[in-house]
Amino acid sequence: MQTVFDFTVPGSAVSYRRSTGAGFVDAAALQDAPRLHTPQMAANWQPMWWYGGWCAGFAAGPRGVAASPAPCLPAADLAGRELPVWFRADLPGEGTYQVSLRLCGRGGPVRVFAGRRRLMWQGTLTEGQVRELRFPLDVTPLVPDGETQPALNAAADLAVTGADLQAVCLQPAAMPRVFLMGDSTVTDQCAGLPYAPGSSYAGWGQMLGRFLPGDWCVSNHAHSGLTTESFTEGGHWAIVEPRLRAGDFCLLQFGHNDQKLPHLAARGGYTERLRGYLRAIRTRGAQPVLVTPLARNTWTADGRYNDLLAEYAAAVFDLGR
């Protein structure tokens, strides 16, 4: 069943409320639904602390809805930065969904994010140019950072910078998924507002969907600080494992934090735990993919690159063989 929102209709752009289940997120919406402030439980936007509150609103016009700065945000602070318009619509529950958007350009770069600030499209639209997009959305429980129990954000969180949002269509759609297991270099990171694309934290898993075919859905369960061990101990594997299906892929990248624990040595506990995940993933009929850990930017005194994770990368290669 499709759910359609047309924001070119006068009066259709309203602030989100839990009672109505759809609308644009502004300061009033966050007062009504404070859980939207929680990282990883909504769109992963966090205003800079010195603004003293939410700094983005929305403005409706004949071409759709665009972001507007809140009174606390000086115009000078937007120089070289972007302000997203954030639309949220509650969904019936867990699953995979197809999202369709219609945008109207403002003569510059455009970025479209879904879920926890996952990049789904970026490009340039000329003034008044209309562009329709389609992409998948994963709605799966996760254990938020700092919490111990799984939580489900059963909603479509969609954010657009540089364009007017004219229409949204949401519908359930079965599709294969790419599950991600890993650490801070993979996870869905928060970004400050106003948004500075070149200097905001982001895991590569946050951008992966932009480069996959449109019928593949990314389900990211990586979190900062995780190891091959704590991914299980923290309850994340208990979410991923039963949801794996034949035809799914599961990408695993650990090492940054395993390296800090003697019992998770590259040729010891690290390899053994990866091997256990590979067996379990294959048992579910899914295809595991080992990813070597991203190396830190460290250098020797004479200016040569110092790869502190080379041993872990070599262990991954050997296990893959």
Residue ranges and their predicted role:
Residues M1-Q189:
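Compositionally biased, intrinsically disordered or flexible polar/acidic segments
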Residues A159-T161, A222, Q253:
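Short beta-strand segments
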Residues A167-A222, W237-F249:
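Serine-esterase "nucleophile elbow" of acetyl-processing enzymes
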Residues S184, T227, N257:
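Gly/Ser/Thr-rich beta-alpha loop segments that engage phosphate groups in nucleotides
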Residues A222-G225, L294:
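Short, solvent-exposed turn/loop segments enriched in Gly/Ser/Thr/Pro and often Arg
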Residues T227-G235:
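Structural motif
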Residues G235-R321:
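Alpha-helical cap/lid subdomain in secreted, periplasmic
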